[in-house]
């Protein structure tokens, strides 16, 4: 037996339709506010962790070591590190011999 034809005023969808409407309404909120909420939660957790001296001391040591390494590497650089290697002279000589 076929179901009766639906009337123009007949509302179907029930719970599934309601959830779909709520989901569509929440999607832009989650999309735009989600990263902000995640970042604020991470910053709050980081702020709570940084109060602990057991984690603050090793972080300071690591930061000092990284800064020292960066400054030493920067100071000893003489500018040759970015230049291309010089062409090999032995290859040039072989090319000249082949042409003769």
UniProtKB/Swiss-Prot annotation:
The keyword Transferase does not apply. Hg(2+) binds at residues 31-32, 82-83. Its main location: membrane. Keywords: Cell membrane, Membrane, Mercuric resistance, Mercury, Metal-binding, Transmembrane, Transmembrane helix, Transport. It is found in: Cell membrane. The chain crosses the membrane at residues 19-39, 43-63. Signal peptide: none annotated. It comes from the Bacteria. It is a multi-pass membrane protein. One of its GO terms (cellular component) is plasma membrane. One of its GO terms (biological process) is response to mercury ion. GO terms for molecular function: metal ion binding. Involved in mercuric transport. Passes a mercury ion from the MerP protein to the mercuric reductase MerA. This is Mercuric transport protein. The gene is merT.
């Amino acid at each position: 037996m076929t179901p009766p034809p639906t009337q123009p005023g007949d509302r179907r969808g029930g719970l599934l339709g309601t959830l779909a409407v709520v989901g569509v309404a929440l999607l832009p909120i989650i999309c735009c506010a989600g990263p902000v909420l995640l970042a604020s939660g991470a910053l709050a957790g980081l702020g709570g962790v940084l109060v602990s001296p057991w984690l603050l001391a090793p972080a300071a040591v690591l930061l000092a070591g990284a800064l020292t390494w960066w400054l030493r590497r920067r100071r000893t650089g003489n500018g040759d590190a970015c230049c291309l290697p010089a062409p090999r002279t032995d290859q040039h000589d072989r090319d000249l011999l082949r042409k003769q």
